[in-house]
């Protein structure tokens, strides 16, 4: 196979020459991604920033930021968005012990996801489940068969879960050096294996050895080896601190493992901070705790209270900028701000969906 890099560099150089002198830096694909992210965030108002940090982001038309729902599903196919190839559940895929096969499955899922997305954008469809950020795989440890979501996992073994999870992430995200085919998300971080009815106020207290040898290896592997683009925090608390604001977990992600993506809460977990756990007095206080801890995106909140938190002095706008920048980086890596001609996955046709080859 001939390398893609010279062609990509040529395309970028030609595009850079064609850009107008007044083109914003964030719109220039020849610029480093971090510089583009910083430039884009600097152009946003506080209310616009807050509106972009929830799953149903409204978008900012004046800057070309699209309306987008970060909530999409692809556990074993993209059938939530209509007809698609549906593969066996994760627990069955894991039973094959064949990580190459799981990689191929995820590669096909990513291709069908891009096909659906490309067609949706062509028809101005911005609905949930037609996006490219997928909250999968579920790499929790399936220890108790009474847990109602065990079939979503790769089983009870941390090594097998790591191998299956890394293979899935690499297949889904693709191998292009510049762009993601789709963005995967490792969930639920951490020690989320039931009991399901108590998940909004349950405090997990695993033995430290069990914590590090059983519950963490898959997450570490997906971050370090799989370069997973997102991590979702769990509803439960861990050692007395809700996972959405747990400094132990964020220290592992950002400082020990070198995570370079974005962190999203499970749906409604910010509300849990002031209703179930009562570690904050209200929504603004909860948002301040979450953003400061390391959370970038919240799911299930109809209206973000981040702007209110800043205006009340509970949070610095620079802290918001840091977390929003992580989100925007994912958008850049998916090619949302670049001409389709530069994004190799933008050409995947809808005919790939539920194709005989898959």
Where are the regions that the model predicts?
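Positively charged n-region of N-terminal signal peptides that target proteins for export
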Residues: 1-5
């Amino acid at each position: 196979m001939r390398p893609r890099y010279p062609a990509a560099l040529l395309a970028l150089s030609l595009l850079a020459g064609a850009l107008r002198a007044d083109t914003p830096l964030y719109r220039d694909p020849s610029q480093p991604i971090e510089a583009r992210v910083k430039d884009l965030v600097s152009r946003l108002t506080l209310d616009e920033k807050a509106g972009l940090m929830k799953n149903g982001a409204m978008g900012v038309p004046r800057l070309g930021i699209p309306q987008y729902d970060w909530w999409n599903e692809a556990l074993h196919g993209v059938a939530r968005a209509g007809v698609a190839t549906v593969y066996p559940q994760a627990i069955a895929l894991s039973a094959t012990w064949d990580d190459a096969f799981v990689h191929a499955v995820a590669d096909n899922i990513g291709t069908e996801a891009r096909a659906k997305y490309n067609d949706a954008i062509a028809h101005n469809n911005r609905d949930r489940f037609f996006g490219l950020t997928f909250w999968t795989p579920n790499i929790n440890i399936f220890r108790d068969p009474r847990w109602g979501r065990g079939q979503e996992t790769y089983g009870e073994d941390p090594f097998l879960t790591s191998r299956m999870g890394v293979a899935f992430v690499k297949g889904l995200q693709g191998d292009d050096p510049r762009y993601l085919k789709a963005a995967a998300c490792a969930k639920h971080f951490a020690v989320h294996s039931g009991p399901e009815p108590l998940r909004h106020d349950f405090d997990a207290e695993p033995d430290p050895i069990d914590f590090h040898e059983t519950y963490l290896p898959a997450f570490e592997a997906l971050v370090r080896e799989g370069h997973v683009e997102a991590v979702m925090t769990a509803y439960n608390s861990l050692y007395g601190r809700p996972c959405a604001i747990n400094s132990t977990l964020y220290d592992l992600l950002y400082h020990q493992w070198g995570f370079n993506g974005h962190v999203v809460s499970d749906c409604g977990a910010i509300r849990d901070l002031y209703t179930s756990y009562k570690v904050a007095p209200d929504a603004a206080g909860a948002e301040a705790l979450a953003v400061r801890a390391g959370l970038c995106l919240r799911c299930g909140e109809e209206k973000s209270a981040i702007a209110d938190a800043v205006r009340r002095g509970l949070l610095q706008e620079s802290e918001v900028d840091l977390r929003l920048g992580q989100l925007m980086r994912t958008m850049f890596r998916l090619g949302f701000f670049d001409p389709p001609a530069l994004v190799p996955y933008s050409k995947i046709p809808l005919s790939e969906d539920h194709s005989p080859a898959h």
